[in-house]
UniProtKB/Swiss-Prot annotation:
Recorded superkingdom: Eukaryota
UniProt feature, compositional bias: Basic and acidic residues: 104-125
Compositionally skewed regions (Polar residues) per UniProt: 81-100
SUPFAM superfamilies tied to this protein: CCCH zinc finger (SSF90229), RING/U-box (SSF57850)
Basic residues: compositionally biased ranges: 24-33
Keywords: DNA-binding, Metal-binding, Zinc, Zinc-finger
Amino acid composition bias (Low complexity), ranges on this chain: 47-64
GO biological-process terms attached to the record: snoRNA splicing
ZnF start-end (RING-type): 265-303
Ranges for region Disordered: 1-142
Identification of the protein by name: Zinc finger CCCH domain-containing protein 15
């Protein structure tokens, strides 16, 4: 029994239960940041550990309590443009622009020919009797091309100039115009339906491609023609001694003119017979005016040239017709 008891005690002492505690690290704590390699500030005992801070959770936009104190009307600009803040350099609308597609003026055919003519002229002035190979200011062994020889015929024929060679066609490519001035004229005459304008009816109806308008329009050439005719008439009135104004008298002026009309011819001093009027507004009988014009080309009253123009005096004839009716 003693052995059994001793064995039981020994067995119970050898198989004693062992309790082991395992600590799990919290999952919601941020890990310690990794220190850079070779850092001298690392503490072996962990006394300098960085306290982990919980990350703040951003408020959800779907939450009813979410709000912002910023101005709601202020929205970020999607497009933004800023000028260079420099004054525009070109303000002449390319009025002085030049054609830059042609050969430069210092190396084109005209410039080469001008240099050749100048070289020949200088060589003749220096030594007119020099040989052809010694043309120019350089040595006689320098070859300057077929056109570099001295012109020994100078003075016996028409001299070579650029202006004289242009017409003959021997100048070569002519220099293009550097400046070009264009004037455009636009005539906005509408295409009006002729049938609708004259009759007010068009067989095509609304499908007509011309404009249905019965108004009066004048194109540019018509306006210019009327202006030229008015200017000619004004200059003619000035040449005849008038003031050149085209003022048309009103009814009051017409009444005054009727009262100022003469009742007899200035020449024969008798009532008018076929009255006529001159440019200077003097009234005569037709027979008296022609008889006086055959002797003197000037007016009988004011001595101004009549130029042989005698118009029918409609005012005198109307007044004579009214007097007969009364």
């Amino acid at each position: 029994m003693a052995d059994g008891g001793g064995g039981g005690e020994a067995g119970s002492g050898g198989s004693a239960p062992v309790c082991s505690f395992v600590r799990k690290p919290p999952k919601n704590i941020r890990k310690r940041p990794t220190a850079p390699a070779g850092s001298d500030d690392d503490d072996e005992d962990g006394s300098g550990a960085i306290a982990a801070a919980r990350a703040k959770k951003a408020p959800s936009s779907t939450s009813k309590l979410f709000f912002s104190s910023a101005d709601g009307s202020s929205e970020p600009r999607r497009f933004q443009y800023e000028s260079s803040r420099t004054i525009q350099a070109s303000t002449d609308s390319r009025a002085t622009a030049t054609l830059e597609t042609e050969t430069e003026f210092d190396r084109d055919a005209r410039a080469i020919r001008e240099r050749q003519l100048k070289q020949a002229e200088e060589s003749l002035k220096k030594n007119p009797s020099a040989p052809a190979s010694s043309s120019g200011s350089g040595s006689g062994e320098v070859y300057k091309g077929i056109h570099g020889y001295t012109d020994y015929k100078a003075g016996f024929r028409r001299e070579h100039t650029v202006s004289s060679e242009k017409a003959g066609g021997s100048h070569g490519p002519l220099r293009a115009s550097a400046h070009i001035r264009l004037s455009a004229r636009f005539d906005y005459q509408p295409d009006i339906c002729k049938d609708y304008k004259e009759t007010g009816y068009c067989g095509y109806g609304d499908s007509c491609k011309f404009m249905h308008d019965r108004g009066d329009y004048k194109s540019g050439w018509q306006i210019e023609k009327e202006w030229e005719e008015a200017e000619k008439a004004r200059k003619r009135r000035i040449a005849m001694g008038g003031d050149g104004s085209d003022y048309e008298a009103g009814e009051e002026d017409d009444d005054d003119d009727e009262e100022a009309l003469p009742f007899a011819c200035y020449i024969c001093r008798e009532p008018f017979v076929d009255p006529v009027v001159t440019k200077c507004k003097h009234y005569f009988c037709e027979h008296c005016a022609l008889k006086h014009h055959s002797k003197n080309k000037k007016c009988f009253v004011c001595n101004k040239p009549t130029l042989g123009i005698f118009n029918a005096a409609q005012e005198i004839r109307k007044k004579m017709a009214q007097d007969k009716k009364q």
